[in-house]
Design a protein with these regions (language model features):
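Core beta-strand elements of the Rossmann-like FAD/NAD(P) dinucleotide-binding domain
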Residues: 2, 138-147
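Central helical "cap/lid" subdomain
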Residues: 36, 145-195, 260
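Glycine-rich FAD pyrophosphate-binding loop
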Residues: 5-7, 18-45
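Short beta-strand to alpha-helix junction loop
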Residues: 56-62, 85-110, 238-249
């Protein structure tokens, strides 16, 4: 029986797994096709890809800054420079933006490269049996661990492990904000020296020019377009039913804002993140080795 079951291979799960693996046996389970969680990377063709979730990391605390700088020394991350335009003209301190060397999911890949990870493995039930956990997977298999660490979004964590959580944890009510993202490939468009644009708009909040991350060279322009909180909240539960409709709305709005013509799009894909991030800081109280 292994010591730790980690649910989720995002940055949080990967960091925890790497640290625990120094002195314990660890195994990771993730419902996705690959590592990364919110820092996932979507491949288009060959080495052309989109960071369609987390766009970059900008450390605020000294401890996290040192952690990221160490990853930079190991060539797991690099700096995303050039021009980042803010059309909202908000006053914010200039900060260094770090990205994964081969996609933002490369951060997780690097951290868990020596740890057994199971993808397409959804944890459907957890049960504590005296001194170990029984984990049921989507294929009905059961696996057994001494300790359990859940790094999934809080609403999912709460649903999965409710009866084992303390009242203090159950009463935590983080405001999870959704995000709707469109990935688009443009042909015959100028390669602008702009890395990202923050818009003052009701539909589109932000867009990243993937070419400027210098992971590939292409005549095609790849843009990741992320919508506003208001637009995302309104439409997150209906985009699956009519993806083409919402892709068109967002791409036409992007055309109006930038001049990039929707008719020049040769690939487009929409993705909805139901639990993209927390709106406000929430005091977290939990034991990262056991839930009881």
């Amino acid at each position: 029986m292994k010591d730790f079951c980690i649910v989720g291979s995002g940055i949080a799960g990967s960091v925890i797994a790497k640290e625990l693996a120094k002195e314990n046996s660890v195994e990771i389970f993730d419902k996705a096709k690959g590592p990364g969680g919110r820092s996932s990377n979507r491949r288009y063709k060959d080495n052309l890809s989109f960071d369609h979730g987390l766009q970059y990391i900008s450390p605020k605390s000294n401890k996290f800054r040192k952690f990221i700088q160490n990853l930079e020394k190991k060539k797991a991350v690099t700096r995303w420079e050039n021009n980042h335009l803010d059309l909202t003209f908000e006053k914010k301190e200039t900060s260094i933006k770090y990205i994964g060397n081969r996609g933002n999911n490369y951060i997780s890949k690097y951290l868990i490269k020596n740890i057994k990870t199971n993808y397409k493995s959804t944890v459907t039930n957890v049960k504590f049996n005296s001194n170990y956990w029984v984990i049921t997977l989507n294929n009905k298999d059961k696996v057994f661990f001494r300790n359990l660490v859940l790094t999934c979004p809080f609403p999912q964590l709460k649903k999965l492990s409710y009866k084992y959580l303390t009242k203090e944890i159950v009463n935590i009510n983080p405001q999870m904000v959704p995000n709707i993202t469109v990935m688009a490939v443009y042909k015959d468009c100028a390669q602008l020296p702009i890395s990202s644009i923050k818009f003052d708009d009701s539909v589109i909040a932000w867009a990243a020019h993937e070419n400027t991350k210098k992971r590939f060279i292409s005549r095609k322009s790849l843009w990741t377009i992320q919508c506003t909180e208001k637009f995302s909240k309104k439409n997150i539960n209906v985009i699956r039913k009519n993806k083409k409709k919402y892709e068109k709305i967002i791409l036409k709005k992007f055309e109006a804002l930038t001049g990039f013509q929707a008719k020049k799009v040769i690939f487009q894909n929409i993705h909805g993140w139901k639990y993209a991030y927390k709106k406000k800081k929430t005091r977290a109280i939990y034991n990262c080795t056991k839930l009881i």
